[in-house]
Amino acid sequence: MAEYIYQMIKARKAHGDKVILDDVTMAFLPGAKIGMVGPNGAGKSSILKIMAGIDQPSNGEARLTPGYSVGILLQEPPLNEDKTVLGNVEEGVAEIKSKLDRYNEISAAMADPDADFDALMAEMGTLQDALDAANAWDLDSQLEQAMDALRCPPPDAEVKHLSGGERRRVALCKLLLEAPDLLLLDEPTNHLDAESVLWLEQHLASYQGAVIAVTHDRYFLDHVAEWIAEVDRGHLYPYEGNYS
């Protein structure tokens, strides 16, 4: 039997008198593409934060299955104010970039006649397997293409000077390159032009992980979602198919 990537079991969450989740039980599989809809103030953003582990239910359970990763695009995403646009985007690929840098270091070290060639070759082989699996040999090109597609500001721009929309595009670019197993998107098409939205739709259509997107953009949902989860007065109602 397939393993769920995420589960809520009798989850309840309230902010004062406002009920966000009322005894909700739900689960979905890896690779699911879900659009979350509902009226403003229904608690959709709060549900995403619970799924991301930023918040917790008051009662019941909400858990990501161990071994899976999760990432979220918040409406006001945090960025590293001490880094440039490129520096923030590179955080999304920090682990694989360090492997690529180490591979290049070993390649240079092999020119030393006194090097321990057996040890270096063994390490290089391990790194090559990881880089092959991540399709990381053209990493710089992948970053450049994603930043261009999402209309990110210039790579050397300081994020502390960016507008809210520019910050969201940088955060979205970083998150997509990070490629978590569960991708949570809060209004992902806000501040994107039509070409960027089209690129995002195509990217998510082939995305290997699960995607949950909160959005009012019904055209986006028609192109991305395979299920719709409607949030209404603390309850969550799933429907198979896209928005239309």
Task: State what each model feature region is.
Residues 1-244:
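ABC ATP-binding cassette signature C-motif
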